[in-house]
Regions:
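Conserved catalytic/switch belt of AAA+ P-loop NTPases
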Residues: 154-168
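Clamp-loader machinery-focused feature within the broader ASCE/P-loop NTPase space
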Residues: 1-151, 325
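Conserved strand-to-helix beginnings and helix N-cap segments that scaffold or border functional pockets
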Residues: 150-154, 284
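Loop/turn-to-beta-strand initiation segments
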Residues: 135-139, 164-170
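Charged, glycine-rich active-site and insertion segments that engage polyanionic ligands
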Residues: 1-56, 60, 64, 78, ...
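Short, structurally constrained coil/turn elements
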Residues: 88-90, 163, 183
Length: 375
């Protein structure tokens, strides 16, 4: 087997993990199951690994040493091209099913859907029966699999129980407990965990060199970036492509402080701007990112209050954390942090969307703790 650097080039940031070693062994022995479940936290790199698996299956020149994809042939580049990292995969034999995917009914519009319904699975059942067009196998990725409705899951189970030849399914889930036990039992599970900081940093340097992305040169900014990632390479990929996540987080903290000091009317006006028109998946995702930032900020305040300042996330904001934490009662801070996390969880499960997302945000904002008068 090749060294870990070569494995990392082929299989990505999780190559040295238990999941990565298991995956390499599957390809080396040519015993890849027809259904894989890749589980792990949001942003840990599940989609990246799924695409690497698809590359390995469709690759024109697979690595003879570690059975990985070459990453440079036509098939590999159509699934991931470092020169165009934001381009969606374009391969006739790879289907990515997600919330908002096409379905079997021409008059259905799923663009704002937060679930994967049975009509989408009906279309996938048909796609699975088709002979691969360009490659020898067909790969169907379902992301996130926990978005399957009950009816869709039941229908999909039948396909898993009798998978068509030369068709492989890869299910991705950050909440695998929401998948039925029967579906999970039909899949081989690979669990991805957050990476240690040193491994994450090594991967980040390699990925930046591959994509031509410029990383922060300031050591403090770089350290804060790695802390914000919490060991999640997928989070870094998504956020660095979109801009400067450290500056964005600073702006989100500014908003959190401003809204905490705002009047009731000002809070509701801000909620209208953020969630009043959150009727599509992208708007809901943006709201979730804001709540993630708020959760991190209020957690830092709580850590400061409980003499755990060494564990705060936003080290560059230490002075603001110290000053702000002194304005709130510790119990109130803890209670509000729980409220943020409950609101975030509701939206994550798709229970609240559209006007209901606005209502959830209203309730949250109206329960921000009252600060003490500063001396």
């Amino acid at each position: 087997m090749s060294d870990s650097t070569s494995l990392g080039d082929r299989w990505g940031p999780h190559a040295d993990s238990q999941a990565g070693r298991t995956l390499v062994a599957m390809f080396e022995t040519q015993r890849l199951p027809h259904a894989l479940l890749i589980a792990g936290p949001v942003g840990v790199g599940k989609r990246d690994l799924a695409l690497r698996i698809a590359q390995a299956m469709l690759c024109d020149s697979p690595d003879e040493v570690n059975a990985g994809p070459c990453r440079t042939c036509r098939n590999c580049l159509r699934l991931h091209n470092p020169a165009q990292p934001t381009l969606d995969p374009q391969h006739t034999d790879v289907e990515i099913v997600s919330m908002g995917s096409l379905c079997a009914e021409s008059d259905h519009d799923h663009r704002n859907s937060r679930t994967i319904g049975i009509c989408v699975i009906r279309r996938i059942e048909h796609v699975a029966t088709l002979t691969p067009f360009e490659a020898s196998e067909r790969v169907i990725i379902i992301n996130p699999a926990d978005a399957l409705t009950a009816d869709a899951a039941d229908a999909f189970l039948k396909t898993l129980e009798e998978p068509p030849e030369r068709v492989y399914f890869i299910l991705l889930s950050a909440q695998q407990e929401q998948l039925s036990e029967t579906i999970r039992s039909r899949c081989r599970t690979l669990t991805l965990a957050p990476l240690p900081v040193d491994r994450l940093e090594r991967w980040l340097d390699r990925w930046a060199a591959e994509t031509g992305l410029e990383l922060p040169s300031d050591a403090q900014q770089r350290a804060e970036l790695l802390r914000l990632a919490r060991g999640r390479p997928g989070w870094l990929q998504d956020n660095l492509r979109d801009g400067d996540p450290v500056s964005l987080r600073a702006a989100q903290i500014d908003d959190a402080i401003r809204i905490a000091n705002a009047t009731r009317a000002e809070r509701l006006e801000w909620a209208e701007q953020i969630a009043g028109r959150s009727t599509n998946a992208q708007s809901i995702d943006n709201l979730q990112l804001i709540l993630d930032a708020w959760s991190d900020w209020w957690r830092d305040l709580w850590l400061q209050q409980t003499n755990q300042a060494q564990s705060i996330l936003h080290v560059s904001q230490r002075e603001r954390i110290e000053g702000t934490a002194a304005l709130y009662d510790q119990g109130a801070t803890s209670h509000f942090l729980e409220r943020i996390q409950r609101t975030r969880a509701l939206i994550e499960r798709g229970i609240t969307h559209g006007l209901n997302a606005r209502l959830a945000l209203d309730v949250l904002l109206l329960n921000i703790p009252t600060a003490r008068e500063s001396s």
